[in-house]
């Protein structure tokens, strides 16, 4: 029996074992790469700043500075531009709090970025501690989900960072099946919906994971793992199939029957509210899909489906870079950095080979089986993939980078790893404990020694300051002097030859956001009709005419109403006649 006097000390030690790895990771993997005084931004001049724009747009919207959330003023005058990509509505309030505390736009983004890692780890710890895993098992599983190599490989895509809904939703699905209750069903729906609001990509992949787990759960029930009976095989097979078919209806009926009438009504109201909020979120995406015709061809998706070799690529890891180099290059390789790390692979092999019986075994192999199924379904070999059948489901034709499903699969992988570590720790062998602590240290080092992609915050801000200065100094015909700005001006910025095409587009978006102007420039996951790189001023009339064709406008006055408001910056080939007559 535990000594009551030592319980507080033991609890403190347990919490230290859980949280010290997180703090080390936060310092060495997240904070240190951001440079002294947070001088560096995670990622490059592309998606990082685009996500910063989205978050700032939300902040301006709640302040009343931007009138319509979904009609952000880039790719102007095309509507519903926020729905061209992820919206970050589920996490933008956190950013707004940082902005309200007087942090500037870029620093508030860094704070939002760092908070995401804390929330992911906290969700893991909450779930795994409720399962009563040993502290070191909790730490290793949570560390992998939060700081694992596949997650770091997506640091240029901050929209994929917040995944705290994944462990919470998966845990509630398991708990509901074990002990049905409508509160758990409501909680499951809540975290799924919030995950969609945090990021549509992760939300869709979470639903796929939950669907597979729901199908598997009856097979991993306590009855399924009971001792074999003496019935003939065909009777056992029929009984197993019947139990599998009826399992979920019986669980739902049990949860419903054991709830009071007020509880049932409250459940229906809450689920209806969650459904309505999800419909409100996805409605604009449905709209742009049909109005703009956005969808991904199967050939586009095929490039972004995991290949067998994808799970062995970690080009940014100095530890595994040489091994990754033996894999021949292929299109979109940056999206195929799916190697989970040598430590996790070793833990998985140990868990599969030892099959140590513990109270978590059913849960562990449920998670591992779900990973195996989704890996097989999404895998492409010589152009063939079972995912082609899923691709026809509503919404999935808009998903291009299916490789990102690894970010969701890191949770069930982490659960299985936690189970293995917990089972080994239960053997209470000093030498085995030492090996486990060594494995945890190596897992930390795999992520610490990672070549991060960062951008100078000062350089990014200087780009915007330089663009603002051009508004006042550029000559007429290539830009309008500030004293002669038209009413309600529209910004249009050229691309310097040395710049990647997206950098000046986002420069224009951010400067226009500061000024409260719309801009013809833009960057997103999809592009409107007629979009061209801003290498030539001819994009200006072409984009306006593309908008007119999109809205079925044909009169020259509509063209002139728009172009007379345009302030072009950095172009040398603008024809002054375009401002008085629509070109053919």
What is each model feature region?
Residues 11, 225-266, 347-386, 427-432:
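Membrane-interface helix-loop-helix junctions at transmembrane boundaries of multi-pass membrane enzymes
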Residues 153-160, 299-300, 304-307, 325-338, ...:
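Membrane-helix boundary/interfacial segments in multi-pass membrane proteins
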Residues 14-46, 53, 57-60, 270-290, ...:
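Transmembrane signal-anchor helices characteristic of membrane glycosylation enzymes that use polyprenol
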Residues 24-120, 148-163, 304-325, 381-385:
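Membrane-interface coil-to-helix junctions
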Residues 22, 28, 112-131, 135-218, ...:
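Membrane-embedded helix bundles of polyisoprenyl
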Residues 265-274, 359-360, 415, 419-449:
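Signature aromatic-anchored transmembrane alpha helix within multi-pass, membrane-resident enzymes
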Residues 444-584:
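Extracytoplasmic
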Residues 45-61, 236, 243-247, 272-351:
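Periplasmic/ER-lumenal interhelical loops and adjacent helix-loop junctions
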């Amino acid at each position: 029996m535990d000594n009551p006097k030592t319980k507080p000390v033991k609890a403190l030690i347990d919490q230290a074992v859980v949280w010290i790895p997180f703090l080390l990771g936060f310092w060495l993997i997240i904070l240190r790469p951001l440079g002294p005084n947070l001088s560096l931004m995670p990622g490059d001049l592309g998606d990082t700043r685009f996500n910063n724009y989205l978050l700032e747009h939300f902040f301006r919207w709640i302040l009343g500075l931007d009138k319509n959330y979904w009609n952000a003023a880039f790719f102007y005058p095309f509507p519903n531009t926020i729905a061209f990509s992820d919206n970050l509505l589920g996490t933008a309030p956190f950013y707004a709090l940082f902005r309200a505390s007087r942090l500037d736009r870029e620093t508030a983004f860094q704070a939002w970025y760092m908070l995401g890692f804390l929330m992911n780890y906290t969700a893991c710890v909450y779930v795994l501690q409720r399962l009563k895993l040993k502290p070191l098992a909790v730490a290793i599983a949570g560390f992998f989900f939060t700081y694992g190599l596949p997650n770091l490989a997506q640091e240029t895509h901050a929209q994929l960072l917040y995944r705290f809904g994944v462990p919470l939703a998966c845990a509630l699905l398991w708990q509901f099946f074990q002990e049905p209750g409508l509160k758990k069903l409501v909680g499951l729906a809540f975290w799924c919906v919030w995950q969609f609001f945090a990021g549509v990509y992760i939300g869709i992949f979470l639903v796929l994971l939950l669907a597979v787990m729901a199908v598997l759960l009856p097979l991993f029930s306590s009855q399924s793992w009971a001792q074999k009976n003496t019935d003939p095989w065909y009777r056992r097979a029929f009984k197993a199939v019947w139990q599998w078919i009826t399992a979920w209806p019986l669980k739902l009926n049990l949860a419903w029957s054991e709830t009071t009438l007020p509880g049932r009504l409250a459940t229906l109201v809450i689920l209806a509210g969650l459904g309505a909020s999800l419909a409100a979120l996805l409605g604009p995406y449905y709209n742009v899909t049909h109005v703009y015709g956005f969808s991904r061809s199967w050939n586009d998706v095929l490039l972004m489906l995991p290949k067998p070799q994808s799970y062995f690529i970690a080009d940014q890891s100095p530890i595994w870079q040489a091994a990754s180099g033996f894999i021949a290059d292929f299109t979109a390789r940056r999206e195929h950095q799916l190697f989970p790390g040598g430590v996790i692979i070793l833990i998985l092999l140990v868990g599969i080979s030892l099959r140590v019986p513990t109270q978590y075994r059913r849960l562990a192999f449920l998670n591992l089986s779900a990973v195996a199924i989704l890996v097989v379904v999404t895998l492409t070999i010589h152009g063939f993939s079972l995912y082609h059948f899923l691709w026809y489901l509503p919404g999935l034709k808009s998903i291009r980078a299916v490789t990102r499903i690894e970010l969701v699969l890191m949770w069930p992988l982490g659960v299985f790893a936690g189970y293995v570590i917990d089972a080994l720790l239960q053997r209470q062998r000093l030498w085995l404990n030492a090996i486990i602590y060594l494995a945890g240290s190596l897992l930390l080092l795999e992520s610490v020694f990672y070549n991060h992609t960062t951008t100078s915050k000062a350089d990014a801000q200087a780009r915007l300051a330089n663009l603002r200065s051009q508004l006042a100094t550029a000559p007429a015909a290539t830009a309008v002097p500030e004293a002669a700005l038209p009413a309600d001006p529209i910004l249009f910025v050229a691309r310097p030859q040395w710049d990647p095409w997206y950098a000046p587009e986002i420069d224009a978006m951010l400067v226009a956001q500061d000024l409260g102007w719309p801009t013809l420039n833009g960057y997103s996951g999809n592009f409107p009709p007629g979009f061209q790189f801003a290498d030539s001023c001819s994009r200006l009339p072409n984009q306006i005419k593309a908008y007119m064709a999109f809205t079925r406008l044909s009169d020259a006055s509509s063209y002139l109403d728009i172009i007379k408001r345009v302030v072009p910056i950095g172009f040398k080939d603008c024809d002054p006649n375009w401002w008085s007559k629509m070109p053919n």
